[in-house]
Regions:
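Nuclease catalytic cores
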Residues: 1-103, 107-112, 126-128, 153-157
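Amphipathic alpha-helical interaction segments
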Residues: 35, 85, 135, 142, ...
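Substrate-binding beta-hairpin/strand module that engages nucleic acids
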Residues: 143-163
Length: 163
């Protein structure tokens, strides 16, 4: 994290974890956005908190976010027309132990349920299993399987993959 790097005297550009840190920053940002109207406030909040520090980083993130939200499917997801469950835990019991999973974004509209997990790195098949797991948990909660759709949104690759 930026604070730890600062204390250790590691420049942000030299940090071995800069790609991980960037992914976490973007994940935090996208989790804070409920509708498209929230983008500027969410970025401003991260600047205020010192998570986004450099003006060029701010400009890059604003541009990446604007571009990501230009995709029609994303515009629908962030339109405000959905009942939203953002970063909400799904809790269940397995072999006598409580377990939790936290999808990035679950949306409901009419009889449709959409699970979206956003990723800021390269495609990986393990992510498909992760979203399938979220979908199975929603089925166990009583939602009809045929009403549940899952997606992986590889933000920086401009790719939405149906699971």
């Amino acid at each position: 994290n930026r604070s730890a790097d600062f204390i250790q005297g590691v420049d942000e550009d030299e940090s071995d974890n800069r790609f991980i840190n960037r992914g976490r920053l973007l994940h935090t940002l996208f989790s804070a956005i409920e509708t498209e109207k929230d983008i500027d406030n969410a970025i401003d909040q991260l600047i205020f908190e010192g998570i986004i520090g450099k003006p060029e980083t701010e400009d890059e993130i604003r541009e990446l976010t604007r571009h990501a939200f230009s995709i029609p499917q994303v515009q629908d997801w962030y339109s405000g027309d959905w009942q939203l469950f953002n970063e909400c835990d799904i809790i269940w019991q397995e072999k006598g132990e409580l377990r939790t999973r936290r999808p990035d974004r679950v949306m409901m509209r009419d009889n449709e349920i959409v699970v979206v997990d956003f990723k800021f790195g390269k495609q990986n098949k393990k992510y498909n299993k992760q979203v399938q797991g979220y979908m199975q948990l929603l089925t166990r909660m009583g939602y009809p399987k045929e009403n549940i759709k899952g997606y992986l949104w590889y933000v920086e690759e401009d790719l939405i993959e149906k699971v």
